[in-house]
From Swiss-Prot:
Chain segments carrying region Dimerization: 143-162
DNA-binding residues: 200-219
Gene Ontology MF term list: 4 iron, 4 sulfur cluster binding; DNA binding; DNA-binding transcription factor activity; metal ion binding
Domain HTH crp-type per the UniProt entry, residue ranges: 167-240
Name of this chain's protein: Anaerobic regulatory protein
Cofactor descriptive note: Binds 1 [4Fe-4S] cluster per subunit.
Role: It is involved in the activation of genes necessary for anaerobic respiration.
PANTHER family registered for this protein in UniProt: CRP FAMILY TRANSCRIPTIONAL REGULATORY PROTEIN, FUMARATE AND NITRATE REDUCTION REGULATORY PROTEIN
Keywords: 4Fe-4S, Activator, Cytoplasm, DNA-binding, Iron, Iron-sulfur, Metal-binding, Repressor, Transcription, Transcription regulation
Organism of origin: Haemophilus influenzae (strain ATCC 51907 / DSM 11121 / KW20 / Rd)
Pfam families: cNMP_binding (PF00027), HTH_Crp_2 (PF13545)
Keyword Translocase: no
């Protein structure tokens, strides 16, 4: 962490779990580390990145207590972060999409405080932390981008706390769907149609709701004509109606990452 502190549309495709991302011609680089780097700096970063083989569904990327060796940039697929309580209960803390980086929360103690597990087949870029830290000390733009990404993660965590403490069940689920819509849109996918890569149980765990409540609310939203649900696929029919269900005017929650 020493060097980080020192610098201290129409026609879009439907997300289906298979968008690959590459540094040189990345279409969503503004969401990842390469954003703002010039060609020479990008080459230096590219040289330290290890492009791993596919991570299979349910495979764990790292476990709580593991030493921080690398930061992981998701190229495709979805990964969830979660902790396990002393009583053995899982608590999901985040869902990571292509373009997201996983592992920043380990910098404080240099070990991971949570688990990271693939919800579907995923591809990641592994970025050795020591080398990244060294490069960040030499490349101001890289350092600034890393700080920006870390700040965004903190902001998202704060908004999630507000969501859980101030919103009722209906508002939580509506905000979750709306946030996914915005995140997929930022990645070049359709904001209107997308696939839920997480189970309803996972969604309920994340939002502090039961599976039955999630199913009931999805049915209610569908009856209202706000969304259509076909298995794991969601279609937003009435965006303004969905936003109204979030109670956004009351809570001012954005929840984009």
């Amino acid at each position: 962490m020493k060097n980080f502190v020192a610098g201290a549309q129409s026609g879009r495709k439907i997300q289906s779990g298979g968008c690959a991302i590459h540094c040189q011609d990345c279409s969503i680089s503004q969401l990842c580390i390469p954003f703002t780097l010039n060609e020479q700096e990008l080459d230096q970063l590219d040289n330290i990145i290890e492009r791993k083989k596919p991570i299979q569904k349910s495979q764990v990327l790292f476990k709580a207590g593991d030493s921080l060796n690398s930061i992981y940039a998701i190229r495709s697929g979805t990964i969830k972060s979660y902790t396990i309580s002393e009583s053995g209960e899982e608590q999901i803390t985040s869902f990571h999409l292509p373009g997201d980086l996983v592992g920043f929360d380990a910098i404080t103690q240099m070990q991971h405080p949570s688990f990271a597990q693939a919800l579907e087949t995923a591809m990641v870029c592994e970025i050795p932390f020591d080398i990244l830290d060294d490069l960040a000390g030499k490349m101001p733009k890289l350092r600034q981008q890393i700080l920006r990404l870390m700040s965004s993660e903190i902001k998202s965590d704060q908004e999630m706390i507000l969501l859980l403490s101030k919103m009722n069940a209906e508002e939580r689920l509506a905000a979750f769907i709306h946030n996914l819509s915005k995140r997929y849109s930022a990645r070049g996918f359709s904001a209107r149609e997308f696939r839920l890569t997480m189970t309803r149980g996972d969604i309920g765990n994340y939002l502090g709701l039961t599976v039955e409540t999630i199913s009931r609310l999805l049915g209610r939203f569908q009856k209202l004509g706000v969304i259509s649900v076909q298995g794991k696929y969601i279609t937003i029919n009435d965006l303004n109606g969905l936003i109204e269900l979030t109670g956004t005017n009351k809570t001012k929650i954005t929840l984009v990452k």
